[in-house]
Every structure is written in structure tokens, then in C-alpha cells.
């Protein structure tokens, strides 16, 4: 073997050493596992290490006919989500499911998911004066048929409370918006609430629930706390009508977008575990993402999600330069 290795390596000691080790390893394998490996020397000054990897002979149809597979116990979250989005088909039943606010997407306890905000949505979330958004919503809801069978039946005071009322601003002790802009930031609502004409029926149903959540137990004085562009008696009437609205399945935090971003940044900086929604500012918001990101596995879906951090000083500068902090 050594003479053969010297011949093949042409005197190169490194090649000779590798050749010897390779042949020795092949010999050890064939000796220790003779039923699996065999070493064969060929006439061309080389060795072949042959492994027995042939499958056992078994007729293809020797087993019993396979029964129809049962997938009823499989848990497929993405498929279930798709069925909810599509309303489980088309037609009247599908339309009812798609428009019924009780069928809004829910998340399991401990689930990590994305709260996506388009450019227009997160810009409105940072804007104090929402008169233009209020006009857009009222214009879309001017058809009385939209409010048929709904209470309250007066859209203007209801929407004014939701966007401009005294309980619709951040309650954090150290609100970043207030520190830098002089006034508490607007309470962060879900993204679709900043695009009322996208789905009017869904918008009005959620507006009822979110307003009930914010003002169902409000104890402040309306005249002193705010100056609505209409008689305050309309607000009192709306508040009294909201008592019959069930908002037990509704929750929004009493914090603004800047405070939400600060909390998300703090979790990443401390390498903590994020629970609940991950803020994702798309469009022009991507320019504020910093290099400090974190990945986390969702315990319910098994997905790995990227948690971004944002440049808060740059966002505050943008707010001031664009006048979003002007009442």
C-alpha cells in the first residue's frame, strides 16, 4: 500500500499522508462494518469503498389499500385566516361574515403578529388636527342608509369624539409627543380607521365600538374639556345612546404612536420578549428603521418575525417640519 501511495503521489508528502489516511479509514470501515462497507482494489491503482444501500425487495402493492386520509384534526392557522378573509366563499353568507365586526381577525394569547400601517395611516396617527379626516368620514357616511338600524344615529359627534375628543389623546405619564410637541399625542387606532372610505360599513361599526370603549365611562365635563363645532347637547345624546352598544371585545391602549414605538425600541434594546402586535410602518416609514433589529419566534404559529426599531428623533423632526403637531 505504501509503495502504491508513493507512486500515485509522485513524492509529495502531503498527498501521500492523505492517501494513506484515506485508505486506512476505508479499511477500518470495511473491517468494523463488513455487512455495510466493502473495500475493492481496482486495476487502476485505486480503491473503491462500496456501501450496501440497496433497498429491500418489497412488492409495491403488498399492503392494504390506503383509506381516504383524514385531515380533520390538522391545525392550519394560515388557511383558517385565509378563509376568514375571503368569507368562506362568495354570496350572501360570505358577505355577512366579511362585514360583521364580530368576525374581525383575533389573535391568540401570547401570539406575536404585525400591526401594519401604510404611509397615510401612520401619518394620520401622528397628526393632531384631524378635521380633514373627519370631513372625509362624514362625507362617506352622508347616506342615511349607512346608519340604518345603528345607534347612535348621529355620525358627526360620534366621529368627532373618536378623533378629537378629550379622551382620544395619550395618557402616558411621560408622553413623548407632549414632551416634544407640547400636547399629548393622538391615541393610536388600528390602521383601517384612518381610511374611512376603504370599507364604510366596517369603519362605522368599529367607530361605534372604539368610541364606546374610550367614552363609555368618561367622567369629564364636555364644555370645559373641548370645543366641538356643534352643540354639546349632541355629544351628550350620543353618549347616552352608546350605553346599549356592546364593546366588551374591544380594546385600544391609551397611548400614542410615538409611545408605542418607544416601547418597541426599549424591548429590542433590552433584548426582551415582545408580546402582541409589532408596529410596522411601511412606505416612507421604512426610512426611519434603524440597524438595531430583533428576531423572535411566535409560540402559536412557529413563525420567526423581525421586530424593527425606529429613529424617534427623526420622526419627531418630521412631525414638526410638516406641521402635524398643529391644532
From Swiss-Prot:
Q: Which GO terms describe its cellular component?
A: host cell nucleus
- Location, primary (coarse class): host cell
The protein's location, in the record's own words, is: Host nucleus
Give the record's keywords alphabetically. Host nucleus
Q: What does the record note as the disruption phenotype of the gene behind this chain?
A: Deletion results in reduced immediate early and early lytic gene expression and blocked late gene expression, while viral DNA replication seems not affected.
Pfam families for this protein:
Herpes_UL95
Q: How does it assemble?
A: Interacts with ORF24; this interaction may serve as a core scaffold for the assembly of the viral transcription initiation complex. Interacts with ORF66. Interacts with ORF18. Interacts with ORF23. Interacts with ORF31. Interacts with host EPAS1; this interaction stabilizes host EPAS1, ensuring its transcriptional activity.
Family the UniProt entry places it in: Belongs to the herpesviridae UL95 family.
* Function comment: Participates in the expression of late viral mRNAs in part by interacting with ORF24. Expressed before viral DNA replication, assembles at the viral pre-replication complexes (pre-RCs) and thus serves as a hub for recruiting a viral transcription complex to ORF24 to promote late viral gene expression. Also plays a regulatory role in the viral life cycle by regulating host transcriptional regulators HIF1A and EPAS1.
Name the chain's protein. Answer: Protein UL95 homolog
Give the lineage. Answer: Viruses, Duplodnaviria, Heunggongvirae, Peploviricota, Herviviricetes
